[in-house]
Regions:
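Long hydrophobic segments that form regular secondary structure
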Residues: 170, 200-236
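Thiamine diphosphate
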Residues: 1-194, 200-205
Length: 236
């Protein structure tokens, strides 16, 4: 959003209140889009990150309306062909309230050759355990896999996400491939390591598997562990 060359193309879309995702900072920095501006005093007006609606706002905050949010995403994701304007829509949602609720619209996005990013936040079975099974997502990737032009990833660390996003932008906006990305993320608080120095790391991330660390090479017993998302940290 700080890059003036790319920020006008970005379309951040959020259902619900966005605070679970730690994205409330957007409210004051770039504002929530409202075609008539703000007509009320928000409940949290005394807070630094209170709701701020503007005619020039950029965040599409659709409330508890996943179908509406996904429809907005499809509109932006197909603007390249309908309006000859390339946009970068990024729809961030509770991963249990994504494909499980709007799978038909996700399929329609594939049919429409949409280009953009879907971020299934709060993914994994440990992220929001206090709220019960409604946020215990361990299967949204199975549903996403039924859409042929949906590219899916379940990263754990920041460098993985950066590599995936860069490749997504290259494929969709440089190579003009008709694909869209579904990426699951977590809201757990943990430290992120540096990207491994191995020259094959970036290629491995994009292929879906890369080496993070070696176990003791002098031991006779060799264990190979494969994991992603929330469970990867426990495996390490």
């Amino acid at each position: 959003m700080r890059d003036k060359n790319i920020s006008p193309r970005l379309v951040p879309i959020i259902p619900d209140e966005a605070r679970t995702f730690g994205m409330e900072g957007f409210f004051q920095k770039i504002g929530i889009y409202a075609h008539e501006g703000q007509k009320y005093e928000p409940e949290d007006s005394a807070q630094l990150s209170s709701y701020r609606e503007e005619k020039s706002g950029q965040v599409l905050e659709e409330g508890i309306n996943e179908a509406g949010a996904m429809s907005s995403w499809i509109a932006a994701a197909t603007a390249y062909t309908n309006h000859d304007i390339e946009m970068i829509p990024i729809y961030t949602f509770y991963s249990m309230f994504g494909f499980q609720r709007i799978g038909d619209l996700a399929w329609a996005a594939g049919d429409s050759q949409a280009r953009g990013f879907l971020i299934g936040a709060t993914a994994g079975r440990t992220t929001l355990a206090g709220e019960g099974l409604q946020h215990q997502d361990g299967h949204s990737h199975l549903i996403a896999s039924t859409i042929p032009n949906c590219v899916t990833y379940d990263p754990t660390f920041h460098y993985e996400l950066a590599v995936i996003f860069r490749e997504g932008l290259r494929r969709m906006h440089e190579k003009k491939e008709n694909v869209f990305y579904y990426i699951t993320t977590m809201n757990e608080n943990y430290s992120h390591p540096e990207m491994p120095k191995d020259k094959n790391t970036e290629e491995g991330i994009l292929k879906g598997m890369y080496k993070i660390k070696d176990f003791n090479k002098y031991k006779k017993t060799k264990i190979q562990r494969l994991g992603s998302g929330t469970i990867l940290r426990e495996m390490i």
